[in-house]
Amino acid sequence: TEEEYRKNLTEEDLFNEFTQDENGNVVMSREDGMKKIKKLGGFDKLYRIKLEADYLAKLAYEGAKKRYGDPLDDETAERIKFELHIMKTMGFPGYFLIVQDYIRAGRGSAAGSAVAYCLGITQIDPIKYDLLFERFLNPDRISLPDIDVDFDDDGRGRVLNWVTQKYGADNVAHIITYGTMATKLAIKDVARVQKLPLSISNNLCKLIPDKLPEGPDGKVPKMNLTNAIAAIPELREAETSSDILLRDTIRYAKMLEGNVRNTGVHACGFIICRDNISDWVPVSTAKDKETGEELHCTQYEGRVIEETGLIKMDFLGLKTLSIIKEALENIKLSLGIDLNIDEISIEDPATYQLYCDGRTIGTFQFESPGMQKYLRELQPSTFEDLIAMNALYRPGPMQYIPSFIARKHGDEPITYDLPCMEKYLKDTYGITVYQEQVMLLSREIANFTRGESDALRKAMGKKLIEKLNHMYPKFIDGGKANGHDPKVLEKIWNDWRAFASYAFNKSHATCYSWVAYQTAYLKANYPSQYMAGVMSRSLADINTVAKLMDECKSMGISTLGPDINESYLKFSVNHSGDIRFGMGAVKGVGESAVLQILAERKKNGVYKSVYDLVERVNLSTCNKKSLESLALAGAFDSFGNITREQFVTPCENGETFLDALVRYG
């Protein structure tokens, strides 16, 4: 307990632990150490951090045994020890304890943390894929940790409810967002109040360009009404018009532009606090757009929240995870197999063949026609190939893809400016693809520290010329000290400067590629079950469903129409391996009607006829409109005796068979 720590540890013990490195070496002066302690909240707070850090270490080492085996090799043990020490000395162990408590699939830079991997926060081994911890948490760059957590669309709400119940409704809050008046919106709002004719208001808005022309200094001015008036003669005329309504509209729009117009709720941001959140920030309520319920909200937006010291958690809903979940349910239902998607082989031949053939429609990240073309040319054979393609297939680095493909097939020589560079560029055939490669190579070539390599990555990515000019001599001097030719070092530096702004975060690319691989694995090995899952998540988009049905046809999978005794709410797979249309995808059939049909079918068996159906279901829920839509879609074809047209064709008395059927029911 915290009390026991207070009895057994002196302030001097804590000072040493929090100001030395992970190996007990003194790395800062007494004065700097005291500043650091003060920044962490003083010695009183350190007892709590130490308690949390020790518990975090216990969980991490337990997880490490499962992930890496027992005993740990030296590299892994050193990595975990270093990460735990940084987390502790930056005051963040409590954050990781909370995240591992509710996590399912973290992504982003957190994938660079071996501790996060051991805790089950991420599913990618950062040591195996050269993902860097300091890309996530850098001791030289005091910034709050940020783990984006992806949940399937249905699971996100459940997790938020669980977090609210666990930590208390008064201790958690969503984050407010403020919508401001943009240039065109300011004009429209003022024109409406001024009763300016709509045609004139629309004409004014049409005069506002999407982008202003370059000024005399060669820079593009910021888009606002003042700058637009300076650039557009017609707007200048409106500003000085003899028409008072027109003139005032411009005048008031200039005053109101940029002001807050409305509020909303941050799509994924969430605050968890140890105390009542209103003790830290002002709170309010806001309506959830989807459910209409009142949500507890901060009155500060995200960037201000961080300045208060509270940590923002991101709970994201990812449609792809919902598709994977649907596919796994279909596999269980149709084949009786409980597949653990996180334990599939990363070297599955069928999956790589699918990528080599470019058959990626319906999979994550790799389904665009351009990507399919490059995959067929590349013939990926390793997971590293997929990560690289994911990182390269974006504006800018896309120009390197032909060279990447040629080098893989031996059509272009793979060269390294220095032999030591092969270690980190081998997997990408000598091409610098990731920010992490620049960081690792700067350490290898010029003895940059972890913090310095991250600062270099940031400076190159954001083209911070002054910072780069400051770091250049250190790179050259460090490289010369290691015996490297200054001319070669200069070439490497210039190559990095040219490409680093395009270089992608490998942690992100790896996480996304892993989810993409999972979808491709399911499509390659359980095609019917996977495609049914994809279509189920596009129920409302008939064009997408039609495209996916064409893909199923090309795969040799039949997509059967809806059937009252075989269909479910969503698309499913029958005993023959065919996909059966979901009744929920039939236009005009509500979800409640389908659930009523399914509940009765489960309870009392299949329906023997349409008469049996209307006798057994609640016709106020499953009404005439639903029955008509199902009949015309062919859901009753299996009963025989009556065609679809006969359900809606009037008899001699003007009544349709469907009317009589409902009356009978």
Roles of regions detected by a PLM:
Residues 1-665:
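Alpha-helical scaffold/interaction cores of sigma-54-like transcription cofactors
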